[in-house]
Structures are given as structure tokens and as C-alpha cells.
Amino acid sequence: MAEKVIMLGNEAIARGAYEAGVKVSSAYPGTPSTEISEYLVQYKDDVYEEWAPNEKVATEVAVGASLAGVRSMACMKHVGLNVAADPLYSVSYMGVNGGL
């Protein structure tokens, strides 16, 4: 039987990303999403993690990795999604090779 683990939401997101095979994660820090990247650091041997100067750049890093065939993730708080809108609109037309 699987072991039950109690986690905070952001910790569970990081664990889920790791278990789903995410290899690249880029994030713009801001509460409450900052902790996702902080929890991902524990998987540093398997996941490349970086802070981005803004949400658009974080999304572009994740899109670039995905276009190269690597499963990736961009983390930001919901109000930063408007800053990341341009690359999100573009990738919706281009498609991806790895998961995003």
C-alpha cells in the first residue's frame, strides 16, 4: 500500500511536477507561488530551476524547453498571467514538443 504524505499545496505541486517528469522550471517570485520553486530545489539533480526577471520571461524559458522536447513548467501568481500573455498566445498556435 502506498504511503500517505501530508503536504502543503505548493509542496504537492512541486512533487507532482517532479513525478510527472518536469525537467525545467522557471518562475517569477511572488506570494503565494514562490514556495513551488523553493520546494522544487530538493529535486535539483533532476530538475533545472531558475528565477526569471518577470512572468513573460519565465513562460518563454518553459516554452523554449518544451519546444526542445523537455517537459517544463512556468510558475507565477495569477495576476502575473497578463504579463505572460504574449508567449502563451503564441505557443497556443505553435504547439509544443514536451509537456508545458
Predicted regions and their residues:
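Active-site mouth loops of central-metabolism enzymes
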Residues: 1-7
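Residue-level marker of alpha-helix boundaries and capping positions
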Residues: 4, 12, 27, 49-53, ...
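N-terminal glycine-rich anion-binding loops that anchor highly charged ligand groups
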Residues: 7-41, 60
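Thiamine diphosphate
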Residues: 32-100
